[in-house]
Amino acid sequence: MGRVYNFSAGPSCLPEEVLKDCADEMLDYKGTGQSVMEMSHRSSAFKPIVEDAEAMVRKLMRVPDNYKIVFLQGGGSTQFAMVPLNLGIRTGKAVYVDTGVWSGKAIKEAKKYVSVDVAASSKDRNFCYIPKIDKITGDYDYAYICLNNTIKGTHWNYIPDTGSIPLVADISSCILSEPLDVSAFGLVFAGAQKNLGPAGVTLVIIRDDLITDSPQKGTPTMLTYKTHTDEDSLYNTPPCYAIYVVGKVLHWIEKNGGAEGMKARNYAKAERLYDYLDSSAVYRATADKDSRSIMNVPFLTKEKDEAKADAINKKFTAEAAKAGLVNLAGHRTVGGMRASIYNAMPIEGVERLIEFMDKFAAENF
């Protein structure tokens, strides 16, 4: 069959141009006679790959000179532990904002290592909005937010003022979807499998003053940021091929206008889909308008009966898949459907989805 439109929350679709480029180099990377998959991470052929990926991150995200960039393993979930282990060393206290499943998991993990205060939460309305916070104050080692919430489809449309408290952000599902002022944060991290590349590599950008050789007692060597910043992501064998693909994606982003180009592309897609949902008599978006994500769009039908709604949702996703629109099922905690429209999703995918939604509505409501 032909290529489908993949609306998965992650791993997600990659630019077709990048996939073809990788395919062309699969058996022979730049005349080396081998695939990057087979290459030693200590070889002269691989070192430029990781250096280029780092340089492209610094260029596209305008990362200041006093920040280090590393490619790690373990996904964003490992960062839930690395952050408190490395940053929670002065007062042993941190402050989090709870905006959904992923910030909730981060809070649960952090409590093993530091005392956690929750500055605000949107749990009261099933995480369908981002709380308004004027300023976060207190004697904390760091403050933590999840900038974009894939499951509930919400996004911070402002950066909270934390004063001198280093701000940490999980930007896994929105990295390079639009410009971001990295200097407003002490540390940001992103699992690659949504907007940067395939699963298996995690990008961390950390300010120099937060890199310590004295993390919490008992912190494993592999969970110490300095271990990796000192060795330029090559302390141990990195996910070589994943980093290689990330580099390709970063060059694709640059070719398509960089972060500003991605912003224009993504807002066009999101506005088209939200406008359709807001004008529909059958479908509705679940996130508050002032908190909506341009990356993840959960939606429900007007069916109120739970059993009937569940049947309708299953029928929708099954028929959508037959039409070449895959991975549209909503998260089990939300139900309904979810369209993840990351950087690589073309506007044509959104148009095809809307056409299908119209047809499905006409036939079932």
Where are these regions (language model features)?
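PLP-dependent aminotransferase-like
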Residues: 77-143
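PLP-dependent enzyme catalytic core of the Aspartate aminotransferase-like
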Residues: 2-4, 322, 331-365
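Conserved N-terminal alpha-helix of the aminotransferase class I/II PLP-enzyme fold
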Residues: 32-79, 100-101, 109
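A glycine-/small-polar-enriched, mobile loop at the entrance of the PLP active site in fold-type I
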Residues: 3-54
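Active-site phosphate-binding strand-loop segment of PLP-dependent enzymes
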Residues: 10, 110, 121-175
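Active-site C-terminal subdomain of aminotransferase-like
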Residues: 15, 187, 192-274, 288, ...
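Conserved PLP-binding catalytic core of the aspartate aminotransferase-like
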Residues: 283-320
